[in-house]
A protein has these predicted regions:
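Short strand-connecting beta-turns/loops that link adjacent beta-strands
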Residues: 26, 67, 94-96
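Ligand-binding loop in jelly-roll beta-barrel domains
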Residues: 74, 83-107
Length: 107
């Protein structure tokens, strides 16, 4: 990949696209491209590592099991997710390309 905006899928792609940008012991950086996808009903991420995520382009709604309100993320917003903090993607803008930069790090 030549850049964060390179090789983007069409806005009508049925699956999210995950691209690993860098991997080192205790560190993984990936680009995630969503085009309207969200977490399956009832599914929660519960990851052993921390994750810092930046929304580069688009809109998304992120929900945490320990928060009553959903977080609406816009381009430029970021969140640091502690290990084992249950979370899910409730919504990404349908028909639009949403680009995430996710940094997974050992706790």
């Amino acid at each position: 990949m030549d850049g964060i905006f390179a090789n983007l899928p069409r806005s009508t792609a049925t699956d999210e696209q995950f691209s690993q940008l860098l991997a080192r012991p205790g560190l993984r950086i990936e680009r995630i491209v969503s085009t309207g996808q969200c977490s399956p009903a009832g599914f929660w991420y519960d990851q052993p590592d921390g994750e810092w995520v930046l929304l580069i382009q688009g809109d998304a709604r992120l929900r945490f099991a320990d928060e009553a309100e959903v977080r609406h993320l816009k381009a430029g917003d970021f969140v640091d997710i502690a290990p084992h903090r249950r979370h899910r993607v409730d919504w990404t803008a349908p028909g639009e390309i949403t680009i995430w930069l996710a940094v997974h790090y050992a706790a």
